[in-house]
């Protein structure tokens, strides 16, 4: 039997990274034992889209969510039977129940369930309601880190900036030209219907 003799010692700063590298390579080779090199590369690839994107299936098209949209200004978005868009503080108001339909990836249309009107924004940034859905009814939905959503017109911009759906402190719609993504008037929390 041969006795092992340590002939060279790695400097301490290099010892740990080398040890971890050996362990990592050994683990990968064990885990990928029966895979081809191509399969191994795709399973270990850290830049694959699945690793870095969140899974929001409803943003991919065709999905319908029924929600109340609660603004950070303490108003629920409402579309009444005459097509008037404004806020209400009554949680149980039937006109504040919305269908949020995914039109394309990140693009939604918002429809009042009771009124059957679609939320729309014109070129001037004014919110209004339409019976028929068209390009004015498409909004880019963005989920913020604070768990609120913003909805910007997918068709219209003002001086290169996005125009957002927003309700002021009195529950009245704010013109899209005067809105920014950071403003709490443009932040809505989609609340599940209970």
UniProtKB/Swiss-Prot annotation:
Q: Which GO terms describe its molecular function?
A: chemoattractant activity; growth factor activity; heparin binding; type 2 fibroblast growth factor receptor binding
Recorded protein name is: Fibroblast growth factor 7
Q: Disulfide bond: present as a keyword of the record?
A: no
Q: Listed disulfide bonds for this chain?
A: none
Keyword annotations for this protein, in alphabetical order, are:
Glycoprotein, Growth factor, Heparin-binding, Mitogen, Signal
What GO biological process term is on the record, naming one? Answer: hair follicle morphogenesis
- Please list which residues make up the signal peptide: 1-31
- The gene behind this protein is Fgf7
Source organism of this protein record: Rattus norvegicus (Rat)
Q: Which GO terms describe its cellular component?
A: cytoplasm; extracellular region; extracellular space; GABA-ergic synapse; Golgi apparatus; postsynapse
